[in-house]
């Protein structure tokens, strides 16, 4: 019997200290991540907004927008995928539908946050959070909707930056009591904060190592020692690809050719390697042999 995606995520977590989860904004990035040795993948809501729609991460994308990108990734790889579902896209029935739709396409885990529906990036100022009671209701709706008990429902709290560390911890405890499996503690700034969080919250904890944000870029050993069970790198690959693409565009505009920026590009041979291109070619040769 095929293991569910949620079970594969839980097994990856059990086998890794900590589990490194890399952001993949498209299916090809997912293939590269798999062949590099990662055991879990991530689809960022900001990544969908920025890469697929050219929009800022301000709650402007819909469930279907994210579902499309997630489905492309789960179709390309068997690695378990964690997906950012923002605030769940509505009330209890909307959240229930969200869970069912993502479960249906083979997503392993989702994280849902306690920001207000007009959300902001977790590392930007002026965030606002809903009451603990409202977030508990969101979690209960999500837990009730899943059909696979191994499908992971992770609660993200943005409250530390708004209400302080202790308030964030108390919220996390309430979220676990409501049925959340794991906690995404957003925008912590010190290793001691992770230690304190882990000591108080009896559940797996995710640390978000996003670049150019509020959190120092600790290494995985430091985070593991501080109690983090998962380390997320949500948009590093996207940012790197953007910068490389910009250099190529500038070279084309300024120099009229790309010869001086070839070293920033992936070679055709490497592209074909990650795609498994030659296996597809061999299959074509078998199906449409010239010897027929």
From Swiss-Prot:
Top-level EC class? lyase
Residues at which substrate binds = 44-46, 121-122, 156, 186, 208-210, 239, 268
Domain of life of the organism in this record? Bacteria
Reactions accelerated catalytically: (2S,3R)-3-hydroxybutane-1,2,3-tricarboxylate = pyruvate + succinate
**Name of the molecule in the record:** 2-methylisocitrate lyase
Task: Give the UniProt family note.
Answer: Belongs to the isocitrate lyase/PEP mutase superfamily. Methylisocitrate lyase family.
Pathway this chain belongs to: Organic acid metabolism; propanoate degradation
UniProt lists the gene as prpB
Q: Which residues bind Mg(2+)?
A: 84, 86
Q: Which cofactor does it need?
A: Mg(2+)
Please name the GO terms that the record assigns under molecular function.
magnesium ion binding; methylisocitrate lyase activity
Outline what the protein does.
Involved in the catabolism of short chain fatty acids (SCFA) via the 2-methylcitrate cycle I (propionate degradation route). Catalyzes the thermodynamically favored C-C bond cleavage of (2R,3S)-2-methylisocitrate to yield pyruvate and succinate via an alpha-carboxy-carbanion intermediate.
User: Do you know which Pfam families this protein is assigned to?
Assistant: PEP_mutase
* Quaternary structure and interacting proteins, as annotated: Homotetramer; dimer of dimers.
According to its UniProt entry, the protein's GO biological process terms are: propionate catabolic process, 2-methylcitrate cycle
* Known EC number: 4.1.3.30
Instruction: State the UniProt keywords alphabetically.
Output: Lyase, Magnesium, Metal-binding
